[in-house]
């Protein structure tokens, strides 16, 4: 298989005994355009949009309310002083990479929340919106909310290397999906080992007894020079890998350039080195939510710095 880097134009050739097509919303594109194969199965895209607003209640409670159309809407505390509200559930037929929340969806979420709370949200309260597409296995049902959230495998062994196509799936069950997918490939890789993820923590989750509060106290003791908000940010986002982010720093100056809020150069370098961040947008919007805590000028200054720092090989 030959690949081309869309940023650099670099091409590479890969050879494999099997291909697992877990491209999500692009799964059928890979089947037809990359593997030059066919499948009777398909996915349908369902758009889910969210809005972020200033937190408008006291306390740490989260809420789940039912709208007039029977859909449930969550209202969660988010990033300290903000609230995350979602989601919509709308059939989507555009390009997955172009998905965005539209005004109708934003109004839908605001109206749903305002049915339950005394303090009414307004359009100008929306700080940010984002949207994603769920690649749901197309089981022929008309209502997007009724489409199965389960996943389906399709193993094609008719061509060269076997092609395992994954239709559907979601982030909360990705480990189970991966495990069962490997079971389907056992006859292709007879030396394959057994299952191992049942009690294996996620990266950064190597916390004794899963006791986060004790872990957080230890972090504060380990880095007494660090502001509590920064300790909280690192602890929640990176867990036991906080030490890799801090990288031996003994004071705030040791974390490198400060971009505003709890955003320091050491975190940027970690994300590029360990979490495949390639662009300033990757860091501000995807790996972190720093964009919510920086001014427009601070965001622009970071983008300019990153673009000239030559951190990405």
Give residue ranges: language-model regions.
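Core beta-strand elements of the Rossmann-like FAD/NAD(P) dinucleotide-binding domain
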Residues: 8-18
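Glycine-rich, N-terminal phosphate-binding loop of Rossmann-like dinucleotide-binding domains
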Residues: 23-24
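C-terminal catalytic lobe of FAD-dependent flavoproteins
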Residues: 29, 34-85, 90-296, 301-312
